[in-house]
Curated annotation (Swiss-Prot):
Name this polypeptide is given: 2-phospho-L-lactate transferase
Names of the cofactor(s): Mg(2+)
The reaction(s) this protein catalyses: (2S)-lactyl-2-diphospho-5'-guanosine + 7,8-didemethyl-8-hydroxy-5-deazariboflavin = oxidized coenzyme F420-0 + GMP + H(+)
Gene Ontology biological-process annotations: F420-0 metabolic process
Similarity section: Belongs to the CofD family.
Pfam families: CofD
EC number: 2.7.8.28
Pathway entry: Cofactor biosynthesis; coenzyme F420 biosynthesis
Subunit composition and interactions: Homodimer.
Class of this enzyme: transferase
Organism listed in the record: Methanoregula boonei (strain DSM 21154 / JCM 14090 / 6A8)
UniProt keywords, alphabetically: Magnesium, Transferase
Amino acid sequence: MITFLSGGTGTPKLLRGMQKVTDRHEISVVVNTAEDIWISGNHISPDVDTVMYLFAGVLNTDTWWGIRNDTFVTHEEILHLGLGEYIAIGDRDRAVHIARGNMLREGMRLTNATRTLCERFGVRENVLPMSDTEVTTRVKTELGLIHYQEYWIRSRGQIRIEDVVRCSKVPPESSEEVIQAVEASDVVVIGPSNPITSITPILECKGIREAMEDKYVIAVSPFIGNVPVSGPAAALMQASGFEPTSAGTAACYKDLVDLFIHDIRDPVEMREAIRLDTLMTGEEKSIGLAEQILALAKRAKA
């Protein structure tokens, strides 16, 4: 068994390769939900959906969000009616949000709702929300404290971040299913997702760090050189007091990681780390990196 910690970008590219080189029933993915949001009365879980759509074979891999060849008739009509839907939601994608929202309103746990949706999509992997507790990442800006989606989508990441804040009514806890997946795994891989808004929220959930203590943990940096492959990781890391580099990423995961992987293009050597080509520009590159990570995990286990 192998468990990944994942956001919605970076790690799914690695998962694209991993599903080709290992038994898909042996893969568990614990997914960030701190970017979840209710829009137009429906529940969007963007990172969970990206992972689910990837495994279902319907992900739009041009954008790494949404469903391939989706239409946007409803979104366009909502805008025509003067409503402020600032996230462009496809029609099939919206159907998933409607279904999830209905299940949550009926009292279903997010974990169970996700399992139901994955079954409908024929997903064989074990896709797990990080928690059934509602958690939200907000960023402090000149506009005040705003939801991460408002910062990244509505404001296009163009406003200065002063701080990153996690908000929840009660302290978030890892679900029993998450703990079981980690405990059953031979290795845990912290994927190359945003350390601040994708991975840290998972690690902040009660129980998961303790479950990972006795596991072999591999972390993959999201930086190519000193630049993140995608998204606002650099600005978010600086606002959180970390250097926006692979070294800064390693500092985020201090005392948790057994092996840190950074890119061959990284200008700085790191102690107790190895270099691999982590720029996954296509499926073959994703497969190559996945095979190398599996080999490292097997070597450590031997």
